[in-house]
Amino acid sequence: RKAEEMIAAGEVRVNGSVAKIGDKVDPKKDKVTVKGKPVESHVQEVYIMLHKPRGFITTMSDEMDRKCVAELVQEIPERVYPVGRLDRDSEGLLLMTNDGAFANAMMHPSKHVPKTYRVTVRPSITEDQLTQMAVGIEIEGRKTAPADVRVLSQEPGRVVLEMVLYEGRNREIRKMCEALGLEVARLKRIAIGPVRLGML
């Protein structure tokens, strides 16, 4: 309340310009002054490795009242946000942070940070299908980037694959499998770059 009064009185400046109520401020980049005196920022950077269960959407709020990952981190006092996405039916490693530079470095396509998944498909997979996944598949008019794919285990009716992707298009693994006539029974992200799910 007091802060709003000071802003309304024109006593608060952001990077030299008079602040308005509702202005967004990045404490790491913006210089905030009150009555000409700099305000020191003490933002604690927080990094969370979360094992997202199936059934949760990767968002901090949902107007349709579906379960979202915000519920899993509500005990954390800092406001954190997901780094990238995992769809509702997928599970596994999700990073959350309040460090925008870190989030951008991890997710920006130019960085090519590898993301590793364990994927259970049905009914079986051929060498030709594995090769197509490895070299890239045409999906919605665009070819997927090459992926590293290997078979971890195989039994009648199901195959477990390890897939490493270097780009992160929306639902890419599911779309690749669908294009090859494979059903995804389970999809779990186990690593983002050097950060592994481990025992979570």
Q: Language-model features: where?
A:
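Basic, flexible Lys/Arg- and Gly-enriched helix-loop patches that mediate nucleic-acid binding at interfaces
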Residues: 1-200
